[in-house]
Design a protein with these regions (language model features):
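Conserved, mostly hydrophobic/aromatic
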Residues: 46, 58, 88, 127, ...
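Recognizes extended acidic, P/S/T-rich segments that occur
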Residues: 444-477, 490
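Structured C-terminal cap/extension of enzyme domains
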Residues: 261-264, 285-425, 431-437, 441-443
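Glycine/proline-rich, positively charged
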Residues: 141, 146-274, 291-298
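Extracellular fibronectin type III
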Residues: 489-504
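N-terminal binding-site loop/beta-alpha segment at the start of enzyme catalytic domains
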Residues: 2-126
């Protein structure tokens, strides 16, 4: 006899199948859709991190941060290890999340210096924490900056790093054992250009006497064991890689990468889900830039922090906001995971877990892991568009409360034209910074003189502040007017203003 739970699962599967079919999809479009167990998780090499991460990583929020009374967050972490997941995320802004990792790490014998320390297991995992503190020295009162921590008021960047190590490997009161380290520290949630200015302060020109030193210069010291900032007198090496996270502004994220003349940034954690193209999107703007720099690319917000389902479109505020079901009758979770993981450039996705269960079909961790068993090109463009069609009506398309609203294709930025004499010839050089893509990718830039197109330059991800450029030799001595037009994949255009060149 079929039980009520079986009837519920069957009805849910029927409704999901109907929803997929209405969008032009079938269950067969998605590898692992109906599978709940994974023998050996797929991995992807994470660019210059030189680590093969499982395609699903454990997010540090959901029940690890906002823990319901009947949930033991330690069991979630231990189950992730048991399932073979090897990428783990947390932050100094996630309340008890780091302490919960600490409890699990003790059970797993991951505490350096303690009897039975499992160094092999520690080397096989990748542990990332984050700091929202933009300054390593001074700067606390500067306006226009998000500067935040769950640590002590007035803390600086390195205080957060030591806090992470103490909570996860030490006594939780500030001490941590020799040999404890973080695989990576991310500058958490950059949202404004002023924050980019702050974190870069002093990088490459560190002066221990400086009044203000940004986060990056100090993190480099604690990565390399150097003391260029004067903030690492013991020459400690507490972290191995440095990166940043951003879910608000692709422009800010791009600026962060383009300023990195010292190749400090090894990874980016970025929001990317099926409603991305309804906003100032990441997939056609910053993600290609990070990929071109060979950065490790970690995705987040696959379910829009639960807003794809039962949670309102706002930041999580308490345990009641935590989503504890697997998808919904009308919106399966698997395709959303696979959308994220088939976004070109993405290596892994971190997803917070609200609920685990002995029944694999009801276990968020197992279902998400099964869905994550997909190759980078595992969905076609039409499959991805069909998934977007499913998620667009959710919350009237406003699930991504953390992301800037949609904007159309922009004109090339900072366009300029100058002339000079070279080998007796008059040469005009036109330069510009990348345009921002709308809901379709950029393809090329067209250069115009006196309302006539004279050439084009293929778009490519702009990985530094060095501008795009076009030159031509001009045979006359007259005045001319130049402009640059951005063109996207569907032929839409956006032109710069006129750039006047005076008579030679």
């Amino acid at each position: 006899m079929t039980g009520s739970n079986d009837r519920l699962i069957t009805r849910r599967r029927y409704l999901q199948t109907t929803a997929l079919a209405s969008a032009g999809l079938t269950l067969g479009s998605f590898r692992g859709f109906g599978r709940n167990t994974v023998a050996k998780p797929l991995t992807r090499e994470m660019g210059r991190l030189h680590f093969a991460a499982t395609t699903l990583g454990l997010g540090g929020q959901a029940s690890l941060q906002w823990t319901p009374a009947d949930v033991d967050p330690t069991r979630i972490i231990l189950k992730a290890f048991a399932l073979g997941i090897n990428y783990f995320d947390t932050s100094n802004m996630y309340g008890p999340s780091q302490a919960n990792y600490g409890k699990a790490f003790r059970e797993l014998h991951l505490i350096p210096g303690e009897a039975g320390y499992d160094e092999k297991l520690r080397r096989s995992m990748f542990l990332t924490s984050k700091t929202g503190l933009r300054w390593a020295k001074g700067g606390w009162q500067k306006p226009g900056l998000g500067n935040f921590t769950n640590g002590k008021q007035g803390s600086k960047t390195i205080d957060d790093i030591k806090r992470s190590l103490s909570l996860m490997f030490g006594d939780g009161q500030g001490d941590y054992p020799r040999g404890a380290y973080l695989d990576m520290v991310l500058l958490h949630s950059l949202t404004a250009m002023a924050e980019v200015d702050a974190v870069y302060e002093g990088l490459g020109k560190a002066d221990p006497k400086a009044e203000n030193i940004g986060a990056l210069a100090a993190l480099v010291d604690y990565r390399d064991g150097s003391n260029l900032t004067g903030l690492n007198p013991k020459g400690e090496k507490l972290l191995r890689h440095i990166g940043f996270s951003g879910h608000h502004s692709p422009a800010v994220n791009m600026e962060m990468i383009q300023r990195d003349d010292h190749n400090v940034l090894d990874a980016m954690l970025v929001a990317i889900n099926a409603n991305d193209r309804l906003h100032f999107n990441m997939q056609y703007n910053v993600i290609p830039v990070a990929a071109a720099r060979n950065m490790g690319l970690i995705a987040m917000k696959t379910f829009a922090d639960g807003a794809m389902y039962t949670k309102p479109s706002r930041w999580t505020m308490n345990p009641n906001d935590v989503v504890r079901t697997v998808g919904s009758a009308s919106l399966a979770s698997g395709p959303l995971v696979q959308y994220t993981l088939t976004t070109p450039g993405i290596h892994t996705v971190i997803i917070g877990t609200g609920q685990i269960d002995d029944d694999a079909a009801a276990c968020q961790l197992q279902r998400n892991l099964a869905a994550a068993q997909i190759a980078p090109a595992g969905l076609s463009v039409s499959d991805r568009r069909a998934i977007e069609k499913l998620t667009a009506p959710v919350k009237d398309g406003k699930t991504n409360y953390f992301q800037l609203p949609a904007q159309a294709l922009t004109a090339p930025r900072e366009a300029a034209a100058e002339q000079k004499m070279r080998d007796g010839k008059r040469v005009v050089r036109v330069t510009w910074q990348t345009a921002y893509a709308g809901d379709e990718p950029l393809v090329r830039y067209e250069v115009w003189r006196d309302r006539q197109k004279i050439g084009s330059v293929a778009h490519k991800p702009q990985v530094s502040k060095a501008p795009f450029a076009f030159e031509e030799a001009v045979s006359d001595q007259a005045a001319h007017s130049y402009s640059v037009t951005a063109v996207d994949a569907v032929g839409r255009t956006a032109a710069s203003g006129d750039l006047q060149i005076q008579p030679a």
